[in-house]
Structure formats: C-alpha cells, structure tokens
C-alpha cells in the first residue's frame, strides 16, 4: 500500500485516504517549534496529499547552541546561528515532506529572535517582540490570502510556555486571520494534555530518569487540563519522519537530551500523538472514544 493510500483508523473511525485539495497553514516562532509540536501531523497530511505551508517568524538567533562544533555561531559570539538554523529548517522540512516553508516578512524584512523576557536581546528594536505589529499582521494576512488555508495551527495566548516570540506569533496569527480576506474555516492551538505529560514523567521516573527535572506535570507551564483537548492526531505511522526532522534541528535538540530520552525510554509513540484545541470552527466527526476530533480537516468543505 502506497503512502497516498494509507489511512489512520481507530476502531471504525477513519480519516480520508486522500487530502488532495486541502490546505493547512502553520505559524511558528522559531525553527524546530514546528517539528516538536506538529511534525507528525505535518508529515501525515502532506503524505496524504494536502498542501502544508509553514510560516516561521524568526530564525532563532538567540537559541542555545547544543553542538560544540557550532558553539561559535551563538548570538554572543559570531552571531551566525540564525543562518545555520535556516539550513536545519530546510533539512527538517525535507524529512517531513514539506516544500512550502517561509519566513515571515521575507525577503524584505527579517524579524530577529527576541530572547526571553527582561534579557538584553528582548530590548532590541529589530526583534519580533518589538515588531511593527500592523506590518507583521499585514504580511501574514497576505500569505493567508495567497494560500487560502482550510485550517490554521498556532500557539495559545501564552505561546505554550511564555516565550515572547511564541506569544507574538499567536497574536500576529490570530490578528492576520481576522484581517485577511480569506476566512479560515478552522483554527487550532497546540496543546499538551496534562495526563499525557504526567504519564511520561511517571514512566521516566520508573526507569530512574526524569523529564526536565520535574516530577509533576503541573510544574510545566505547557501542561494543560485534558478538558482543553478537542482533537487528537494519531500520527504514529509518520513518527519516523518526525524523529528525522528533530535530528535535523541538531543545534537545538540534543540526541542525549530530554526529548530523545522520552522516545528512547518510552517508545516513538510518545512523539506520534499530537493534540490540539479548536478555537474557531465547528467540531466535527469522526471522534475518538474521548469525543475528540481525529481529523483536523473534518467538516471542511473544499473551496
């Protein structure tokens, strides 16, 4: 059976076998955010024929460099990390099968990574946090009108964990969706259910390890009550593509770090399941046993 003919099924709940004509837009803050949050979803829908477009708002110049050979590229040294992460993003998108990926504002504008709140990088006038909001919104609205997505995926109001660029990406994405001529039928925010995170923490603890040094999911700002989850994408058939994309982001995701430790100890399925909350549009069948959508395009009419 070819990739285009594959389907995900839970009992009698089935997704379509082809998504040709369907269009998804994802808006993220830095290279690697898309893979960690949505890699399996992106790979699955792309393999099944959907057009998947990624807009990344910054090049992640202020990120920590986890590879010694590239340490000199850090913002505090040669300041070449952004250029390198462009290459990593291209490699990750190749792994996921995504051909349409762009940076917000390119080629005329470049928004710099803002760093964390109350840091020196956060005070720079060229960073995304201090952006001309109307300009950035207009740039993204133009992409929306070009792509005409049926679904938009981005962060919640706190950007998952409070990073300024994640918060700003959320604000720009939601404002652009409001201001664009094309009205997106369904908008989703990334969400990580508390129960899933706690299961991972407990399983790691049983193996004598930990995840990010915590023993309670409530200590992680991105852990949300399970009631917030309205959609669950089973992308386990595409998790190998997601792992390859994670490896492509080598300066940011260490192979001996917590993300790979989860899959090494608990199995790849820990990264194959991705969760969302629907904030615009109608929740539509098919549903899983918990009443969550199993297809982000459900209920969408092609146009």
Region roles according to the model:
Residues 62-64, 109-118, 160-163, 170, ...:
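Short catalytic/ligand-binding loop motif for oxyanion handling, primarily in non-cytosolic enzymes
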Residues 150-180, 185-195:
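Hydrophobic, aromatic-enriched interface-forming segments
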Residues 4-148, 175-179, 277-280, 285-289:
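Active-site rim/loop-helix segments in enzyme catalytic domains that contact anionic ligands
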Residues 124, 153-157, 224-229:
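Flexible glycine/proline-enriched surface loops and loop-helix/loop-strand junctions
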Residues 4-19, 116-117, 178-303:
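C-terminal accessory domains and tails appended to enzymatic cores
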Residues 54-56, 102-105, 151-154, 162, ...:
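A structural signal for short, well-ordered beta-strand segments and their strand-loop junctions
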């Amino acid at each position: 059976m070819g990739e285009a003919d594959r389907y995900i099924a839970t009992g009698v709940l089935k997704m379509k076998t082809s998504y040709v004509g369907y269009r998804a837009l994802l808006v993220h803050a830095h290279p690697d955010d898309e893979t960690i949050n949505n890699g399996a979803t992106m790979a699955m829908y792309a393999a099944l024929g959907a057009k998947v477009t990624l807009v990344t708002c910054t090049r992640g110049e202020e990120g920590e460099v986890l590879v010694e050979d590239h340490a000199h590229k850090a913002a505090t040294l040669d300041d070449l990390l952004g250029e390198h992460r462009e290459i990593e993003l291209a490699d990750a998108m190749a792994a996921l099968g995504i051909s349409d990926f762009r940076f917000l504002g390119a080629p005329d504008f470049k928004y710099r990574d803002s760093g964390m709140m109350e840091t020196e990088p956060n005070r720079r006038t060229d960073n995304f946090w201090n952006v001309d909001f109307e300009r950035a919104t207009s740039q993204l609205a133009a992409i929306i009108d070009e792509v005409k997505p049926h679904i938009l995926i981005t962060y919640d109001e706190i950007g998952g964990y409070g990073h300024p660029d994640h918060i700003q990406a959320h604000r720009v994405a939601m404002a652009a969706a409001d201001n664009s001529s094309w009205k997106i039928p369904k908008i989703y925010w990334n969400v990580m259910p508390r129960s899933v995170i706690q299961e991972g923490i407990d399983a790691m603890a049983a193996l004598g390890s930990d995840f990010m040094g915590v023993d309670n999911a409530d200590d992680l700002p991105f852990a949300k009550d399970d009631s917030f989850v309205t959609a669950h994408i089973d992308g386990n058939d595409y998790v190998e593509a997601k792992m390859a994309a994670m490896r492509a982001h080598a300066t940011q995701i260490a192979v001996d770090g917590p993300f790979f430790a989860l899959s090494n100890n608990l199995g790849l399925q820990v990264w194959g399941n991705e969760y969302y909350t629907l904030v615009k549009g109608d929740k539509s069948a098919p549903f899983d046993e918990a009443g969550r959508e199993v297809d982000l395009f459900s209920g969408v009419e092609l146009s």
